[in-house]
A protein has these predicted regions:
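N-terminal nicking endonuclease/strand-transfer module with a His-rich metal-binding environment
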Residues: 1-151
Length: 151
């Protein structure tokens, strides 16, 4: 259900990925949310955090896709609850934007997280500990909706 996508090291990474994720053709219901940023200015605000802490090199963001099987039935409200919960998980330290894409046979959520902490500038590492922590959180959230984690 979750898929990491891409390396985002160039200066246009924030703008390119966020523009793709929030494309109105893919998000006709406007199901876009975020934490620690204004969704209309997410790319600029993420870039500003990286600039303030002089962390403009290496991978700039995490782009994760949470995809639901066409066999799984889940209402839009449930998808948004799961996306909100995942955004909340990272919100203590990071800026997060999500967008629910409805342009395919199955809905999916694009999550974009600034790898630079807005609080103190530390960089998200994506360690095994972090991976298993978010995985456990996601499994718990999915169970609330009668879904399961498929990876």
């Amino acid at each position: 259900m979750i898929n990491q996508a891409g390396k985002f090291q160039d200066s246009s990474a924030y703008d390119d990925v966020i523009r793709y994720c929030t494309n109105p053709d893919k998000t006709p219901s406007g199901l876009i949310g975020g934490r620690n940023l204004d969704t209309d200015y997410a790319a600029e605000q993420m870039e500003t955090v990286a600039d303030v802490f002089d962390k403009n090199s290496k991978t700039r963001l995490e782009h994760t896709v949470l995809s639901f099987s066409p066999k799984e039935e889940i209402a839009q409200a449930g998808i948004v609850e799961i996306a909100d919960s995942l955004a909340d998980y990272y919100a203590k330290d990071y800026q997060v934007l999500y967008a629910v894409h409805e342009n395919t046979d199955h809905p999916h959520v694009h999550m974009v997280m600034n790898r630079i902490s807005y609080r103190d500038g530390h960089r998200y590492r994506g360690s095994k500990r972090e991976y298993y922590g978010v995985r456990a959180h996601l499994k718990k959230e999915l169970r609330k909706h009668g879904l399961h984690l498929d990876y």
